[in-house]
């Protein structure tokens, strides 16, 4: 059975850079094993939104902590970034903070890429997925330390070398919302990432089996793939506050179809704020009783997920960390 890990999601769309660093430091002090950060050029909402640069945040947190695993959840290495440069950045961080850095990747969203110069209609999944696979292949080659001449459909290098690379390169975690990418994550990734609140069938019958199939096809032990899930949890001893705290994150309750081509935070905010609080809260575990909260989290462990990263929606994150350490962590550790 894979090791149970508890992580903290640093909400880059909600907090300014310095505060976000301090929250990750506090997460380590409160017993978390990892801290992940999203990589947004623009936040989900305009009013009260933030978008600090993920890689600067990771290095700042790396200097202030000693044991937290640090990674993106997730970064898109395929449009506004050149994957060769991302490979260099993560190799450098891997040298600075050995055995603590991982790169979580996904296929991208219009919100972050069109504002930075992508022209034309936002690509459908087929192209975005092809770009992701090619970028992962290029980064893996560069981390071997050799000179790389790469001639892909989307990316090219000529005699490219990364001179400072930790032994073994950097673990890559691949975000998967369906079985096709989950299978790829098992085959090509060191870990895979999914998010909570989407129904038991998705995890038990699609994502986990597909991930295991991909790993086995690649000759890997599926249990060696770190299975991360971002668990959206609004836990507070005050039930009204637990519900109300979810409101800031209403954009997460928009469907993929509703937000596919939205590239403006103001437009995203407008669409999200039209949703009733009941619909917003459906994506979250909303609880004021610790046993109830842990019972709902335990379902994901039963599905086969071992790295639980907790995303709390409220503005008072220190309160959440204190309540988490007092009420939830002791119960959660018993699940492992």
Swiss-Prot record:
The active site is at residues 40, 109. It is an enzyme of class 1 (oxidoreductase). Coenzyme F420-(gamma-Glu)n binds at residues 39, 76, 107-108, 112, 177-178, 180-181. SUPFAM superfamilies: Bacterial luciferase-like (SSF51679). Substrate binds at residues 195, 198, 259, 283. Belongs to the F420-dependent glucose-6-phosphate dehydrogenase family. This is F420-dependent glucose-6-phosphate dehydrogenase. It comes from Mycolicibacterium gilvum (strain PYR-GCK) (Mycobacterium gilvum (strain PYR-GCK)).
């Amino acid at each position: 059975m894979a090791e149970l890990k508890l992580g903290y999601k640093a909400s880059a769309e909600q907090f300014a850079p310095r505060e976000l660093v301090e929250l990750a430091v506090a997460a380590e002090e409160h017993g978390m094993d990892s801290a992940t950060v999203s990589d947004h050029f623009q936040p989900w909402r305009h009013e009260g939104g933030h978008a600090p640069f993920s890689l600067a945040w990771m290095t700042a947190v790396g200097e202030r902590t000693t044991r937290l695993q640090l990674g993106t959840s997730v970064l898109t290495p395929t449009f506004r970034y050149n994957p060769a440069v991302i490979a260099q950045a993560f190799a450098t961080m891997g040298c600075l903070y050995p055995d603590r850095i991982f790169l979580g990747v996904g296929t991208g969203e219009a919100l972050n890429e069109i504002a930075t110069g992508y022209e034309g209609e936002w690509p459908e999944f087929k192209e975005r997925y092809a770009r992701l696979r090619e970028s992962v292949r290029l980064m893996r080659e560069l981390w071997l330390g050799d000179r790389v001449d790469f001639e892909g459909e989307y990316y090219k290098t000529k005699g490219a070398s990364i001179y400072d690379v930790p032994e073994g390169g950097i673990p890559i975690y691949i975000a998967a919302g369906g079985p096709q990418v989950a299978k790829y994550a098992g085959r090509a990734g060191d870990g895979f990432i999914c998010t909570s609140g989407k129904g038991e069938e998705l995890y038990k019958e699609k994502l986990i089996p597909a991930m295991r199939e991909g790993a086995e096809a690649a000759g890997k032990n599926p249990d060696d793939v770190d299975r991360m899930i971002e668990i959206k949890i609004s836990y507070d001893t005050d039930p009204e506050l637990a519900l109300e705290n979810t409101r800031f994150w209403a954009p997460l309750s928009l469907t993929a179809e509703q937000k596919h081509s939205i590239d403006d935070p103001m437009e995203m905010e407008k669409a999200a704020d039209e949703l009733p609080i009941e619909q917003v809260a459906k994506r979250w575990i909303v609880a004021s009783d610790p046993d109830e909260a842990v019972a709902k989290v335990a379902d994901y462990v039963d599905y086969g997920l071992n790295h639980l990263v907790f995303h709390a929606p409220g503005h008072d994150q220190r309160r959440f960390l204190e309540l988490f350490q007092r009420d939830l962590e002791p119960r959660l550790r018993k699940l492992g």
